[in-house]
Design a protein with these regions (language model features):
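N-terminal positioning helix adjacent to the helix-turn-helix/winged-helix DNA-binding module
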Residues: 22, 33, 56-57, 117, ...
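Charged, amphipathic alpha-helical coiled-coil/dimerization segments
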Residues: 6-12, 90-149
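N-terminal helix-turn-helix DNA-binding core of bacterial DNA-binding proteins
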Residues: 39-83
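C-terminal regulatory/oligomerization modules of transcriptional regulators
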Residues: 1-19, 142-169
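N-terminal leader segment of winged-helix/HTH proteins
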Residues: 1-51
Length: 169
């Protein structure tokens, strides 16, 4: 019985030894990829001579798209990746990239949607992503199957983290 317990402990320690470096590398890559995506978006706007908007704001406008949302919905739906939703929404309204109006249902809530100017930014990001879709397999060496497997793993990781918060695991 003692031998079985030692094998069980050893195998758990071995699994931990295998998972730890892979998990920590994945965390580093996710964080680095997010920063790199913002760099790619910034570079696209720089190439077009646009310095009126930053990459976080452009990504926010892209994620809003044709929807009409509240700032709270931006956070809860995961569309917003930064820490200060209110600040960027306020700036985008001031710069006329976003419409804002009181909700007809809940007068406390402000609904936001893209202006024509915001749609133009959305279209720049859409065009960038379309260019990537056409070249990522040939130049980046990443196939549709690779993305499918990656998306399954990332969705599982997101669910794991969500459960950590929700159920205080």
């Amino acid at each position: 019985m003692n031998t079985v317990l030692k094998k069980e402990t050893l195998s758990r320690a071995e699994r931990l030894g295998e998972v730890r470096p892979a998990y920590l590398e994945a965390l580093t890559l996710v964080e680095r990829l997010h920063r790199r995506l913002l760099d790619v978006i910034k570079d696209e706007f720089d190439r077009r001579g646009r310095s009126d908007i930053n990459a976080v704001q452009a990504l926010l406008l892209y994620n809003i798209g044709d929807k009409e949302l509240t700032a709270g919905e931006l956070r809860t739906r995961g569309y917003y990746l930064g820490s200060n939703v209110s600040y960027n929404v306020k700036k985008l309204v001031e710069m006329q990239y976003l419409h804002h109006a009181r909700s007809r249902v809940d007068r406390r809530a402000v609904r936001i949607s893209l202006t024509q100017r915001g749609r133009e930014v959305h279209d720049v990001v859409t065009s960038l992503y379309e260019k990537h879709v056409l070249t990522v397999e040939q130049i980046g060496g990443i196939s549709g199957d690779d993305f499918s497997r990656l998306n399954v793993a990332l969705a599982r990781l997101e669910r794991f983290w969500t459960d950590q918060i929700r159920f205080r695991l």
